Amino acid sequence: MFGNQFDISGKMVGENTNPVLLYAVETCLQLTLAELNENLREIYVEAYTVPENIELIHKKTAVQLQKIFVPYLPDYSASDFYEMEIGTAAFMRGYMARPCDMYFTLERKLARFLSMSLSVFKVPQEEQEAILSYIENLNIREIANKVMQQLFVTLEMKYEFTLTN
């Protein structure tokens, strides 16, 4: 489920896009999926909580983070990115676990998450603003709904069940 989102995000923003933009779209997609479906929220929160699962997430994501953010942190080692992944995964888990409300809307959640995580990786402010603007102009709910439907169809085929409306 997690790996497929990078593929979907890549198709959305284009093959040769800025990797930081791809990271932003992918993480916003995860947060939006959790917000739109309580079952997915539970799955994500559990994945970010169960020790065996989160360790796998940390290891795989740290490799991706190093590829994406090494231009901003050229002196950082693989272990530095692993340690940073532990922290940014905590951002993700916390934001997934907390449903939006009238004060903390999805738009504010996405903007705050990106501001915090991109700052950790020392992405320049101007680039952060351009990425936030791009995300704000996406219909992230519609995109997440399409991804969710694709996910459910895949699950139906793999596990031979049917979801009813």
Sequence positions of predicted segments:
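Short, basic, alpha-helical segments at the C-terminal edge of helix-turn-helix-like DNA-binding modules
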Residues: 1-6
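Hydrophobic alpha-helical connector segments
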Residues: 7-40, 46-50, 56-63
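Generic structural signal for hydrophobic core residues of well-folded globular domains
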Residues: 9, 34-37, 92, 99, ...
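Short, surface-exposed acidic
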Residues: 17, 74-81, 125-131
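Amphipathic alpha-helical packing segments from all-alpha helical-bundle domains
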Residues: 25, 46-100, 104-118
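Short, hydrophobic secondary-structure boundary micro-motifs
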Residues: 41-46, 126-130
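C-terminal peripheral helix-coil segments that are non-catalytic and often amphipathic
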Residues: 67, 71, 101-165
